[in-house]
Swiss-Prot record:
Na(+) binds at N82, T386. One of its GO terms (biological process) is amino acid import. Disulfide bonds join C245-C281. Inhibited by N-methyl-D-glucamine. Inhibited by choline. Allosteric regulation of sodium ions binding by pH. Glycans are attached at N258, N274. InterPro entries: AA_transpt_TM. The gene is SLC38A2. Residues 1-76, 124-158, 210-217, 314-329, 393-413, 458-472 are cytoplasmic. Residues 97-102, 178-188, 239-292, 351-371, 435-436, 496-506 are extracellular. This is Sodium-coupled neutral amino acid symporter 2.
Length: 506
């Protein structure tokens, strides 16, 4: 349900052709026709952000003549909004429940502003560096190390996005089947076991779609994802006024104990005191606990869209950096409001009882609810069809790294696809909660893509500004902030894992 696949996009027509005198750095060349690119912009899936276009292997050099963009301002806003929003929205209420309303709004504001600033750095670097490819900017800045850092970060982000989608299948599909079959006792039924269902969906639906050599109609699923999330937000707001408070804590705790699909540690504080009107239904504005550390990575994970910015920029009609920044400002502000409303109303519905995946929390209280069942079906369809879109760039990166000089082979193509899907399924089965995926990927790959790489590329490639300039000093502080956020978040998350491991909290 999100972020398109990483990018070997067609090169911007106004690039310096001398920068591409050799094609030895890449084994793929990319189509520069507007029609080829435009037809794939619905493919930008928000949680991954790197859409790989089909390559033209016979081409020796990038096209350098000017090709004006053809995508309108409004459609560019939609494309970028679609690249931002994704499964991360399901974890925002959990983040608010562990930070408090005021602290969450402060963090959300800072992360959105920093993400927008990194888009500014990225656009300026692309203009000065003469490339609209994220990996190529890395190569121009730091050689092979920079290229691998960009490619690795985007691949990790894609794997995290894919895992989060399969986690949603693991969480929600058993509830849908249980609601449709009216089964009360699901003990021992394999078709109500989330792990079995993830494997089944992967084999029957995702694998066949992932074996295609091109995306075709799958590219349009990201648009469906955005619509599903808007529908989800409307339902979250409506349900706030239907779910009674205080929430029946015993019911939630029983549901948590009886299922492996919830986050046990999220409910521990609720066990230590009686649930009363003043206690359970009072919002908190500042909260600090062991789960607060996940808030920033979840927010960072939710705002990653940066590898999608460059191809959207290339296709923008009347293209200019100022115009693209206006597109970015509108998109980020719209997603800021959407994230804030989803987190706020989700939190004000369940307070400290919010689980790490908000949609699953409703089943503990409302059981079989028709409206929620429709939301679940829509979200399940969107994420299931989006996973094959996410697999494309990962497979292409692996192929490019290991077998760049070899001709296409269906056996190799299939083996890499199966391996990627198998690895992701293992993560989903053995990683206890979606919160861990949001936290780890948000703290590592997403921090690289938002903070570290854009600022490092800017410092290295924008030559006309001296290091003592305000712009370069700002980029340097941004880089150091990213390193601090990444190392600090990762350290605290690992400490939380170690601390909770003996008690089975993870």
């Amino acid at each position: 349900m999100k972020k398109a696949e990483m990018g070997r996009f067609s090169i911007s027509p106004d690039e310096d052709s001398s920068s591409y005198s050799s094609n030895s750095d890449f084994n793929y060349s990319y189509p520069t026709k507007q029609a080829a690119l435009k037809s794939h912009y619905a493919d930008v899936d928000p949680e991954n952000q790197n859409f790989l276009l089909e390559s033209n292997l016979g081409k020796k050099k990038y096209e350098t003549e000017f090709h004006p963009g053809t995508t309108s301002f409004g459609m560019s806003v939609f494309n970028l909004s679609n690249a931002i929003v994704g499964s991360g929205i399901l974890g925002l209420s959990y983040a608010m429940a562990n930070t408090g309303i005021a602290l969450f709004i402060i963090l959300l504001t800072f992360v959105s502003i920093f993400s927008l600033y990194s888009v500014h750095l990225l656009l300026k670097t692309a203009n000065e560096g003469g490339s609209l490819l994220y990996e190529q900017l890395g190569y121009k800045a730091f050689g092979l190390v920079g290229k691998l850092a960009a490619s690795g970060s985007i691949t990790m982000q894609n794997i995290g996005a894919m895992s989060s989608y399969l986690f949603i299948v693991k969480y929600e599909l058993p509830l849908v089947i249980q609601a449709l079959t009216n089964i009360e006792d699901k003990t021992g039924l394999w078709y109500l076991n989330g792990n079995y269902l993830v494997l089944l969906v992967s084999l029957v639906v995702i694998l066949p779609l992932s074996l295609f050599r091109n995306l075709g109609y799958l590219g349009y699923t990201s648009g469906l994802s955005l619509l599903c999330m808007v529908f989800f937000l409307i339902v979250v707001i409506c349900k706030k006024f239907q779910v009674p408070c205080p929430v029946e804590a015993a019911l939630i705790i029983n549901e948590t104990i009886n299922t492996t699909l919830t986050q046990p540690t999220a409910l521990v504080p609720a066990l230590s005191h009686n649930v009363t009107e003043n206690d359970s239904c009072r919002p908190h504005y500042f909260i600090f606990n062991s789960q607060t550390v996940y808030a920033v990575p979840i927010l960072i994970f939710s705002f990653v869209c940066h590898p999608a910015v460059l191809p959207i920029y290339e296709e923008l009609k009347d293209r200019s950096r100022r115009r693209m920044m206006n597109v970015s400002k509108i998109s980020f502000f719209a997603m800021f409001l959407m994230y804030l409303l989803a987190a706020l109303f989700g939190y004000l519905t369940f307070y400290e009882h919010v689980e790490s995946e908000l949609l699953h929390t409703y089943s503990s209280i409302l059981g079989t609810d028709i409206l929620l069942l429709i939301v679940r079906l829509a979200v399940l369809m969107a994420v299931t069809l989006t996973v094959p879109v996410v697999i494309f760039p990962i497979r292409s990166s692996v192929t490019h790294l290991l077998c760049a000089s070899k001709d296409f082979s269906w056996w190799r193509h299939s083996l890499i696809t199966v391996s990627i899907l198998a690895f992701t399924n293992l993560l989903v089965i053995f990683v206890p909660t979606i919160r861990d995926i949001f936290g780890f990927i948000g703290a590592s790959a997403a921090s690289m893509l938002i903070f570290i790489l854009p600022s490092a590329f800017y410092i290295k490639l924008v030559k006309k500004e001296p290091m003592k300039s305000v712009q370069k000093i700002g980029a340097l502080f941004f880089l150091l902030s990213g390193v601090l956020v990444m190392t600090g978040s990762m350290a605290l998350i690992v400490l939380d894992w170690v601390h909770n491991a003996p008690g089975g909290g993870h």
